[in-house]
């Protein structure tokens, strides 16, 4: 039995006593205790692949701030790593793959990993975290979106131009669809396994969907997000596990995402919550959408922006604050001040009381 079920109630558009709040990258380098754990573990992957350390890092922000959810400490690139692409990290450059997939032979060799063998460390982390949370708040599991994972798998790492994957979209769209289909199968299996291990809410991060034109988004990202929402077994009634579809630059597609079958849509700061709520039309909850850079502001500026965000949602939702989960529009940066995060959380709690 959850002691704090605000997140789950809000994602299901049920009444809550105040707006729940959690933050993308709430467990991260801005926390000195995270940096100490990382130094001890030796690397990011050394933390992510050790269930006990992943649990420790997941719980760190909850020991500082009265957040309404924990999110599994992991990485979106665990699936392609388990497919054999071999994930590694370069300081200052981010994630890379030793074996990117760029031709038909490589793509057709890919299969869905076994979730309790190749990705057992993730499921073990979920189980350990659930035990340690002891019902205090829900645990969110997550995956990257098929399009976003395919970007990394083809480019071999992060990119500014996405030239390789866009070239494939234009020159060999059927091959790209084959890859996206395989990755979607893996994402569905991965999220289902996290749910079976104990995740109580799920989120898909479509980090790079916003680099696509509207026509390409509707061909190469949206159908696969919709497939996840419709095919992922999440239970029924009060036991149903809510799914959030988050994307950077997805404001133009809120109505499409609201029709996907997901319980909630996460948006960034490039669309107002009032506009997003009107587009959603009451079909889904909304999550977001404070610009993370707000945390560089003064405490008064942070409180002011929190108030504006809460009011914007209510404005687009017929005056009601129900069905809103407060979050940033993207993850926090390493140089942000933990004290300012505390100001944000306190402001959401005090300003959103019903």
Curated annotation (Swiss-Prot):
Documented EC number(s): 4.1.1.37
Protein origin, superkingdom: Bacteria
Chain positions of site Transition state stabilizer: 75
UniProt main location, coarse: cytoplasm
Any single GO BP term: protoporphyrinogen IX biosynthetic process from glutamate
Pfam families on file: URO-D (PF01208)
InterPro entries in the cross-refs: UROD/MetE-like_sf, Uroporphyrinogen_deCO2ase_HemE, Uroporphyrinogen_deCOase
Protein name: Uroporphyrinogen decarboxylase
